[in-house]
A protein has these predicted regions:
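Acidic, low-complexity intrinsically disordered regions
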Residues: 1-188
């Protein structure tokens, strides 16, 4: 039934990174099956609490003791509606403290903002790199500092020198988000 609907066809610009580092842009036609919209609240504290319970219980299983630690990806507009900043920082710290013998849980935040005028950021290295927007900076503070063994991969993705990075992006491109998720979820 959905396929038979008369849906609009959109011209979408795609960005793809080639193995040699060049970026290829192309335009493809895509049907818009469902029109995205935002409505309602963002119960981020409740989502983080559920994530905490899941990683805590998973890490408590003896067979998982030496496994690669869990990775939590939070995709959000950044505006938690069910707690204040201190409450979000507290539950995020609890998530980041749970782990295995291979390391602690990585909490990675993907902040999608309606303000497209700001420069996109992937694996932020400081709060100052982000727009002067409290939700972006809060998500930076609650994101995990990435383990040093990822620094070279992150620096290659960002096109910069290795430094300290956080698992946080702000309005990043689809290509960069996929790169972020690949880096954050691959055991090294």
């Amino acid at each position: 039934e959905l396929y038979e609907r008369d849906t609009p066809r959109l011209q979408i610009q795609r960005e793809r990174k080639l193995p040699d580092g060049r970026t290829l842009f192309s335009v493809v036609e895509q049907r818009e099956w469902i029109t995205p919209f935002a409505q309602g609240q963002t119960p981020m504290h409740a989502a983080f609490l559920k994530a905490y319970e899941l990683v805590r219980d998973w890490c408590a299983i003896r067979a998982h003791g030496a496994c690669y630690p869990p990775v939590v990806f939070n995709i959000t507009d950044g505006e938690a509606s069910d707690c204040d900043e201190a409450g979000l920082e507290e539950i995020a710290a609890r998530i980041r403290q749970v782990g295995t013998s291979d390391g602690n849980t990585l909490l990675m935040n993907i902040h999608i903002s309606s303000d497209l005028s700001k420069v996109p950021v992937v694996f932020a290295s400081s709060e100052e790199e982000l727009p002067d927007q409290r939700y972006a900076r809060l998500l930076y503070r609650v994101s995990s500092e990435m383990p040093p063994l990822y620094n070279e991969s992150i620096a290659a993705l960002r096109g910069c020198q290795p430094e300290i990075f956080r698992g946080m992006s702000y309005n990043a491109s689809m290509t960069d988000l996929i790169g972020m998720m690949n880096i954050g979820s691959v055991s090294v």
